């Protein structure tokens, strides 16, 4: 892709991100690549049929309009599924950077022009492709991911028959913070010996496998293969759809846990927020160790950048990024590890293709589209409940209980009001998160506090103080 095409594609992606919002963009468009532009048509690709179908059904007009804003002559956008290439073993040396991946510090296992993945096959069930670069050795540990890394390492080092400490282990975070890296590292480490069977599956792969088994009347073999696994690793659980598929996942989850087998799951939100999943599944997932990977701090971002430069030198020995440039990138590219990966890739390409050393001026020009304005903090209902309980000297369980004493009712109403005004949750969902209350109860609380804050200056000050604490 020429520099002109790359710049054009970056602008189109920027328009698309602004149009649909960051969450939608990260979920559905982050792995979409530009293949070519010919006259009046654009050829894009995605790694899975599921993504292709969803984008074509829900966003085809949006994608076309974003391209037409850049190139008015475009009248057709073709979307295809790119095929992964398979390899045999994980890389033993420090990995070289490749094209950036959705959700992780490392690049996609399914990019045709990047890392070459490998599949793990166990009996009747084939696992999702594994990227040989995604190992514990290449994972950069920092304050925001220490607990997740330690828990994943504990799982990976377990032996068949050992007591299972964290089951299921549930890791959640925003896009590009290292979930898939850790899950694949668990799989590689677990399969390094011959003692245990460790299987890595994306939620999409699980869905397609189960549906295919139903169609071919091999569902029994599918179930037996899954339940014969010692460690089942499921990625991107938020994409698990369909009541029948969810029921089978729930049965598999219960069967493995009850048999003392390990389950590791990753998603982009905590179990309680997976509203599309059955309550039984959410409850079972929440019963294990739930670990959040927080946004990358500046020190961790700097560490990731340094590791990518070292990785690049395994193939390009003369490549170097001066410390001031690394510090600039760590300070200004704050969104996720994928953007940091992309920044190093761009500097490497520019330096090698133009035979120029990396400078601060070059970096400022090459990564300008990766520097995004600060986004407002995502506030969770659990945070609201915790801070309100602390403010009013009650417990979180009091807020969720049926108690109707004055010292509990008012804090509960304030918490519901803040949940409605500071989150995108619906009234029924807020009610469910406050002890299974009806949406009318939430609506009454919201209206009650709205009326009081306009007349009661003390309450108004308390609410504003709570908002500041939540937004810090």
Swiss-Prot record:
Q: Where is this region: Domain II?
A: 73-128
Compositional bias (Polar residues) at which positions? 110-119
Q: What does this protein do?
A: Plays an essential role in the initiation and regulation of chromosomal replication. ATP-DnaA binds to the origin of replication (oriC) to initiate formation of the DNA replication initiation complex once per cell cycle. Binds the DnaA box (a 9 base pair repeat at the origin) and separates the double-stranded (ds)DNA. Forms a right-handed helical filament on oriC DNA; dsDNA binds to the exterior of the filament while single-stranded (ss)DNA is stabiized in the filament's interior.
Protein name (Swiss-Prot/TrEMBL): Chromosomal replication initiator protein DnaA
Q: Where is this region: Disordered?
A: 90-124
Give the record's family classification.
Answer: Belongs to the DnaA family.
Region Domain I, interacts with DnaA modulators: what ranges? 1-73
- Indicate the quaternary assembly: Oligomerizes as a right-handed, spiral filament on DNA at oriC.
Extent of Basic and acidic residues compositional bias: 99-109
HAMAP family cross-referenced by the UniProt entry: DnaA_bact
SMART domains tied to this protein:
AAA, Bac_DnaA_C
Q: Which organism is it from?
A: Rhodopseudomonas palustris (strain ATCC BAA-98 / CGA009)
The UniProt annotation places ATP binding at 176, 178-180
Region span, Domain IV, binds dsDNA: 352-472
Query: Record's domain comment?
Result: Domain I is involved in oligomerization and binding regulators, domain II is flexibile and of varying length in different bacteria, domain III forms the AAA+ region, while domain IV binds dsDNA.
Q: Which GO terms describe its cellular component?
A: cytoplasm; plasma membrane
Annotated compartments: Cytoplasm
């Amino acid at each position: 892709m020429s520099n002109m095409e790359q710049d054009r594609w970056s602008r189109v992606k920027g328009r698309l991100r602004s149009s649909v919002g960051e969450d939608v963009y990260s979920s559905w468009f982050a792995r979409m690549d530009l293949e070519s532009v010919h006259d009046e048509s654009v050829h894009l690709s995605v790694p899975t049929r599921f993504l292709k179908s969803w984008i074509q059904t829900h966003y085809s007009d949006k994608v076309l309009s974003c391209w037409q804003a850049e190139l008015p002559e475009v009248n057709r956008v073709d979307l295809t599924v790119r095929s992964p290439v398979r390899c045999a073993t994980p890389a033993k040396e420090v990995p070289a950077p490749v094209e950036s991946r959705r959700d992780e510090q490392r690049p996609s296992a399914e990019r045709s022009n990047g890392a070459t993945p490998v599949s793990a096959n166990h009996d009747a069930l084939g696992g999702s492709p594994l990227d040989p670069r995604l190992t514990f050795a290449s994972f950069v540990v920092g304050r925001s991911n220490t607990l997740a890394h330690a828990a994943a390492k504990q799982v990976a080092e377990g032996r068949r028959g050992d007591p299972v400490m964290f089951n299921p282990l549930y890791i959640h975070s925003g896009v590009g913070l290292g979930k898939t890296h850790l899950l694949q590292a668990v799989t590689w480490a677990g399969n390094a010996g011959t003692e245990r069977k460790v299987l890595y599956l994306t939620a999409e792969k699980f869905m397609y496998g189960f549906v295919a088994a139903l169609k071919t009347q091999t569902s029994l073999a599918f179930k037996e293969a899954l339940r014969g696994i010692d460690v089942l690793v499921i990625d991107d659980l938020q994409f698990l759809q369909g009541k029948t598929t969810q029921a089978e996942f729930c049965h598999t989850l219960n069967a493995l846990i009850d048999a003392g087998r390990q389950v590791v799951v990753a998603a982009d939100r905590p179990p309680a927020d997976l509203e599309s999943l059955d309550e039984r599944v959410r409850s079972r997932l929440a019963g294990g160790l739930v670990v959040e990977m927080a946004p990358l701090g500046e020190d961790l971002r700097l560490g990731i950048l340094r590791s990518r430069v070292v990785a690049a030198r395994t193939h390009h020995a003369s490549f170097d990024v001066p410390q001031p440039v690394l510090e600039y990138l760590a300070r200004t590219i704050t969104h996720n590890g994928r953007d940091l990966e992309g920044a190093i890739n761009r500097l490497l390409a520019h330096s090698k293709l133009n035979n120029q050393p990396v400078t601060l001026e070059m970096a400022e020009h090459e990564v300008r589209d990766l520097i995004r304005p600060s986004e407002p903090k995502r506030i969770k209902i659990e945070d609201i409940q915790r801070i309100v309980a602390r403010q009013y000297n009650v417990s979180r369980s009091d807020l969720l209980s049926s108690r109707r004493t004055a010292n509990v009712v008012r804090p509960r109403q304030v918490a519901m009001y803040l949940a409605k005004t500071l989150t995108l949750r619906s009234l029924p969902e807020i009610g469910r998160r406050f002890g299974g209350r009806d949406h009318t109860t939430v609506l009454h609380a919201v209206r009650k506090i709205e009326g009081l804050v306009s007349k009661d200056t003390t309450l108004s000050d308390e609410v504003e103080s709570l908002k500041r604490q939540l937004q810090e």
